[in-house]
Amino acid sequence: MRGELWLLVLVLREAARALSPQPGAGHDEGPGSGWAAKGTVRGWNRRARESPGHVSEPDRTQLSQDLGGGTLAMDTLPDNRTRVVEDNHSYYVSRLYGPSEPHSRELWVDVAEANRSQVKIHTILSNTHRQASRVVLSFDFPFYGHPLRQITIATGGFIFMGDVIHRMLTATQYVAPLMANFNPGYSDNSTVVYFDNGTVFVVQWDHVYLQGWEDKGSFTFQAALHHDGRIVFAYKEIPMSVPEISSSQHPVKTGLSDAFMILNPSPDVPESRRRSIFEYHRIELDPSKVTSMSAVEFTPLPTCLQHRSCDACMSSDLTFNCSWCHVLQRCSSGFDRYRQEWMDYGCAQEAEGRMCEDFQDEDHDSASPDTSFSPYDGDLTTTSSSLFIDSLTTEDDTKLNPYAGGDGLQNNLSPKTKGTPVHLGTIVGIVLAVLLVAAIILAGIYINGHPTSNAALFFIERRPHHWPAMKFRSHPDHSTYAEVEPSGHEKEGFMEAEQC
């Protein structure tokens, strides 16, 4: 009996020894720092650690994930292993690829190899400093859950994603692979190129130089907007450390940002409204990790706006506190670009303590103040004479050049201004134009049939060869965009050019 017990003890000891970790296994947590990403959600910061006990092969990529936002830092891996750092920022998951990671090269879009009909060199932006121009996409791009068809490309290495143009383009609502004081007009080799093939829109700042830092060399990088909402930053040439770039004349940022606008009565000007901009989310990347041949990929996460029914909204398991607004037929957390309507229609109070069954017996037509209003008509704006912008400051003075097609230069009207007056004015204008054309035709027929009449003699005395000559010559080097202000005079703030 004792022999059997002793044998059992030996077996258990050997089993325990076999299951215990061997020396040297696991992670080699040496000193140093790797990729880092920082997501800013008001008052939220925490550090993530690598999961212990996972053995990585020497040539395998090691992945770290932070599910709470905040700051993510990793130790340097031994040998020649590369890394991918993944960070969850509530709205996006960012993956940062180091220079030696093969996927970073795959994310670079070779514009030179693309279809030439889909590639355009923006001649205005390529020859100016602190300019911005609107471009229409060939597809709806979901940005923070909001479908966008127009974006604004700036010479300063970023894309402005806002619907309403204001003076602080660099402050918020941007996609910034590397926002800095770039001057494409410094060199003939500097260009701002964009490419659109229907599924991806790419903007490339090619061989651009920093204003006042031209001796440091040229920068080449791009931002890609994919139709599924993914955003990619790819860096080909970064000749200097990004933290060394001065921000005294222009903000220096890398990341994403979005905001909503609120209209409030202006205390200074009667019957006017003040537009205040509130940034509700920002993703900041560590600028020290922006190097040549690196890349960042942002994958969008589901938001409340994607739910189109009350049942789907209320049963959502997202981290957002989704609520259903029956008046607007919209699912929202209350913090998005449509917050103005959410407040105006009392959606926050409507959703308190109510279930989807409570809305089924209500008359939808009577419940909605304006049944023709679409939840996706954009930000609520005003037609008042005065408009102010609060709560944002910047050192930038980028000017805006309107898109050649003239789209998107005026603000959207509020729901109450849409409807019969617009259609009635259009009809009256068409009728007047038809009557004018008919009158001219009848006058021509009459004059041709009565050459000795007073009207015919009046026009004969004033025949065209007595009129002063007025010729329009085409100047290939002249800009088709309106001048923002006289050359040599520059003032702070963004200026929007009026289209001629």
Swiss-Prot record:
Its main location: secreted. GO terms for biological process: angiogenesis; spinal cord development. N-glycosylated. Detected in urine (at protein level). Detected in endothelial cells from colorectal cancer, and in endothelial cells from primary cancers of the lung, liver, pancreas, breast and brain. Not detectable in endothelial cells from normal tissue. Expressed in fibrovascular membrane with increased expression in individuals with proliferative diabetic retinopathy. Residues 19-426 are extracellular. It is found in: Secreted. Glycans are attached at residues 33, 80, 197. GO terms for cellular component: bicellular tight junction; cytoplasm; dendrite; extracellular region; extracellular space; neuronal cell body; plasma membrane; receptor complex. Residues 20-39, 46-78, 359-379, 479-500 are annotated as: Disordered. Residues 448-500 are cytoplasmic. Pfam families: PSI. The chain crosses the membrane at residues 427-447. Keywords: Cell junction, Cell membrane, Cytoplasm, Glycoprotein, Membrane, Proteoglycan, Secreted, Signal, Tight junction, Transmembrane, Transmembrane helix. Residues 47-60, 479-494 have a biased composition (Basic and acidic residues). The keyword Signal applies. Residues 1-18 form the signal peptide. Residues 368-379 have a biased composition (Polar residues). Belongs to the plexin family. Plays a critical role in endothelial cell capillary morphogenesis. Interacts with NID1. May interact with CTTN. This is Plexin domain-containing protein 1. The lineage of its organism: Eukaryota, Metazoa, Chordata, Craniata, Vertebrata.
